[in-house]
C-alpha cells in the first residue's frame, strides 16, 4: 500500500503556526516576568507533564513547615507565660520584703518559693529550646522546594528558548515588522534575526517578538 506523500504546508498554514508559536512565546515571556504566578502557572503546567505535581509538592511542604512552626510556638507559649507570671510575682514579693521586712517564717516561705522557681526554669527553657529547634528544622523544606522551583523555571526557560529558535530559523524575512528610526533608538540595540542562537537577554527577547509583530 502506497503511503500518501506529505505536501508542504502552504504559506497561510505556516503563517498561522508561526503566529501561534509567537503568541505562546510571548505568554511564556510574560509568565517569567511575573514570577510564573496565577494563571500563567496554570497555562505553563499544560505544557509540562508533572508541573502540577511539582507545584502541589511545594505547597504541601510549605504548609507542613508553617504548621510545625505554629504548633511549636503554641506549645512554647504556656511555658513562657508561666515563667513571666511567676517571676513578676516573686519580684513584687521581694520588693515588699525589702521595703518592710516580714517575719522569719514568711521570709522562709519566700525563699522556698524562689528556689522552686529557679528549679523550674531549666525545664521551661529546655522545652522552649526544643520547640525552637523544631521550628528551625522545619525550614529545611526550602532546600527541597527551591530545587523543584528551579527545575520548573529551567524547563520553562528551555521551552522558551526552543520556541525562539524555531522563530529565528523559520520566520520569513518579509514578515518582520519594519521599525521607524525613532522607535529603534528608543528600544536600543536590536536583534540580528538572520542568525540562530543570538538571543542573549530578556530585552532582546522582547525586541525580537516586537519586531516579528507578536
UniProtKB/Swiss-Prot annotation:
Region described as Disordered: spans on this chain: 176-199
Bias-annotated ranges (Polar residues): 184-193
InterPro entries in the cross-refs: Chemotax_Pase_CheZ, CheZ_family_phosphatases
Enzyme class: hydrolase
Main localization category: cytoplasm
Quaternary structure (record): Homodimer.
Name this polypeptide is given: Protein phosphatase CheZ
Species: Salmonella typhi
Organism placement in taxonomy: Bacteria, Pseudomonadati, Pseudomonadota, Gammaproteobacteria, Enterobacterales
Amino acid at each position: 500500500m502506497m503511503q500518501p506523500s506529505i505536501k508542504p504546508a502552504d504559506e497561510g498554514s505556516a503563517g498561522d503556526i508561526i503566529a501561534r508559536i509567537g503568541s505562546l512565546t510571548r505568554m511564556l515571556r510574560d509568565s517569567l516576568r511575573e514570577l510564573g504566578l496565577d494563571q500563567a502557572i496554570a497555562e505553563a503546567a499544560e505544557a509540562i507533564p508533572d508541573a502540577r505535581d511539582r507545584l502541589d509538592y511545594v505547597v504541601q511542604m510549605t504548609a507542613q513547615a508553617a504548621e510545625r512552626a505554629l504548633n511549636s510556638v503554641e506549645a512554647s507559649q504556656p511555658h513562657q507565660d508561666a515563667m513571666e507570671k511567676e517571676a513578676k510575682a516573686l519580684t513584687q514579693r521581694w520588693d515588699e520584703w525589702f521595703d518592710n521586712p516580714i517575719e522569719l517564717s514568711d521570709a522562709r516561705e519566700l525563699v522556698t518559693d524562689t528556689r522552686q522557681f529557679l528549679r523550674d526554669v531549666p525545664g521551661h527553657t529546655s522545652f522552649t529550646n526544643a520547640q525552637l529547634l523544631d521550628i528551625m528544622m522545619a525550614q529545611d523544606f526550602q532546600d527541597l522546594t527551591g530545587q523543584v522551583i528551579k527545575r520548573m523555571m529551567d524547563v520553562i526557560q528551555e521551552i522558551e528558548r526552543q520556541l525562539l529558535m524555531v522563530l529565528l530559523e523559520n520566520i520569513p524575512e518579509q514578515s518582520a515588522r519594519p521599525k521607524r528610526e525613532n522607535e529603534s533608538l528608543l528600544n536600543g540595540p536590536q536583534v540580528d534575526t538572520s542568525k540562530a542562537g543570538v538571543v542573549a537577554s530578556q530585552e532582546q527577547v522582547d525586541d525580537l517578538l516586537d519586531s516579528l509583530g507578536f
